[in-house]
Curated annotation (Swiss-Prot):
Function: Catalyzes the condensation of pantoate with beta-alanine in an ATP-dependent reaction via a pantoyl-adenylate intermediate.
Binding site for (R)-pantoate: 57, 150
Organism: Laribacter hongkongensis (strain HLHK9)
Family to which the UniProt record says this protein belongs: Belongs to the pantothenate synthetase family.
Protein name: Pantothenate synthetase
Lineage: Bacteria, Pseudomonadati, Pseudomonadota, Betaproteobacteria, Neisseriales
Active site: 33 (proton donor)
């Protein structure tokens, strides 16, 4: 596996690589990331994984400084998974002037759901993903459905800006008890880890009610919020949206997604389930 640290080296490697699939990450890799790698290997002859903890997508008071940097373990996992190249730029390589004067500004959806609690987050995501697309020039790029809003924004960005990249969604990886795999799960104490699967259970309960024909979305959302809060969670949101557009859902719609973000202890977890009825 080649380890590439500069844009110049990445572009030189790319010229000889044939069809390439990219998996953008912030490191601290887990089985969910490796599932993205496996899908990427189906999409292209060569696979590039990027590791870059992107300051632009962290807000004030968030965990940029404490976000786990686990390079040696990540490198070993990627090599064992058969990745062809690891793109590992430092911050000055991607942001030579530190600040970024030109950004990719998503539409109003960036201010809803997670965006309402993380101002500027999706601008930072869209900007760094565009930079990675410009540098690596992948034919395909794999993104997990756990970050459903992020996936939607990237798909819309690629379509609207005619970026020549196939965006490949990959299903959420889960632990045996249903908890969505996340690098931030490592922040959980033993007791919090035991409680954490409740988020998925509440979303699954909403899904069952929707499949059974329930259309009182507000009551379903409120019941889930109340249950989580009774068990010590601080809930940012539980919302039922249109799966294809992330617009507000209306009674009787067939393609839905239930999205949630909530904190248990100091750890913010997100999850979602899709419904096709």
């Amino acid at each position: 596996m080649d380890i590439i640290r500069t844009i110049e080296e990445m572009r030189s490697w790319r010229q000889k690589a044939g069809r390439v699939a990219l998996v953008p990450t912030m490191g601290n890799l887990h089985e969910g990331h490796l599932a993205l790698v496996r899908e990427a290997k189906k999409q292209a002859e060569r696979v590039v994984v990027s590791i870059f903890v992107n300051r632009l997508q962290f807000g004030q008071g968030e965990d940029f400084d404490s976000y786990p940097r686990t390079f040696e373990a990540d490198r070993d996992k990627l090599a064992a998974a058969g990745v062809d190249a690891l793109f590992l730029p430092d911050e000055r390589e991607l942001y030579p002037r530190i600040r970024q004067d030109f950004n990719v500004e998503p539409p109003h959806i960036q201010d809803e759901l997670c965006g309402a609690f993380r101002p500027g987050h999706f601008r930072g995501v869209a900007t760094v993903v565009t930079k990675l697309f410009n540098i690596v020039q992948p034919d395909a790029a794999c993104f997990g459905k756990k970050d459903f809003q992020q996936l939607h924004i990237i798909q819309a960005m690629v379509a609207d800006l005619n970026q020549p990249v196939k965006v490949v969604p990959v299903d959420i990886g889960r632990a045996a008890d249903g908890l969505a795999l996340s690098s931030r799960n490592g922040y959980l104490s033993a007791g919090e880890r035991e409680e954490a699967p409740r988020l998925f259970r509440e979303l699954s309960r909403i899904r069952e009610n929707l499949i059974d024909g329930e259309n009182d979305y507000a009551s379903l959302e409120q019941d889930a919020r109340a249950t989580l809060e009774q068990h010590g969670w601080r809930v940012d949101y539980v919302e039922i949206r249109q799966a294809d557009t992330l617009e507000l859902a209306h009674a009787g719609e067939k393609r839905l997604v239930v999205l949630a973000a909530a904190r248990i202890g100091k750890t913010r977890l997100i999850d979602n389930v899709e419904i096709f009825r």
